[in-house]
Amino acid sequence: FPBGZFTMZGCPZCKLKZBKYFSKLGAPIYZCMGCCFSRAYPTPARSKKTMLVPKNITSZATCCVAKAFTKATVMGBARVZNHTZCHCSTCYYHKS
């Protein structure tokens, strides 16, 4: 895959999708959804030696996140991000 990105079968690409829950309350609200790159591989021995808690498997991933967004108010006073552009980048929410 020359550009480093690929699509997995059954998993849509990272793109804007309308949020049906918030959109039914007025103007459409969009959020980034879809798949990006991820892989897992055995942890190299030299890396294991530097880990506080050695792990046998190392994983790498990027997540579908907003590259740009605007703030919107829904349900009277709830502030949400209305995504306007998506890309695959650092995963902000993950288990440690």
Swiss-Prot record:
Entry superkingdom: Eukaryota
Subcellular location: Secreted
Keyword Electron transport attached: no
Sugar attachment sites: 56, 82
Principal localisation: secreted
Disulfide bond positions: 11-35, 14-64, 32-86, 36-88, 63-91
GO BP, sorted A to Z: G protein-coupled receptor signaling pathway; positive regulation of steroid biosynthetic process; regulation of signaling receptor activity; thyroid hormone generation
GO molecular function: follicle-stimulating hormone activity
SMART domains the record matches: GHA
Protein keywords: Disulfide bond, Glycoprotein, Hormone, Secreted
UniProt cross-references to InterPro entries, sorted A to Z: Cystine-knot_cytokine, Glyco_hormone
Cellular component terms (Gene Ontology): extracellular space; follicle-stimulating hormone complex
Subunit structure comment from the entry: Heterodimer. The active hormones thyrotropin, lutropin and follitropin are heterodimers composed of CGA, a common alpha chain described here and a unique beta chain which confers their biological specificity to the hormones: TSHB for thyrotropin, LHB for lutropin and FSHB for follitropin.
Family of this protein: Belongs to the glycoprotein hormones subunit alpha family.
Function: Shared alpha chain of the active heterodimeric glycoprotein hormones thyrotropin/thyroid stimulating hormone/TSH, lutropin/luteinizing hormone/LH and follitropin/follicle stimulating hormone/FSH. These hormones bind specific receptors on target cells that in turn activate downstream signaling pathways.
Protein name: Glycoprotein hormones alpha chain
Gene source species: Balaenoptera acutorostrata
Gene: CGA
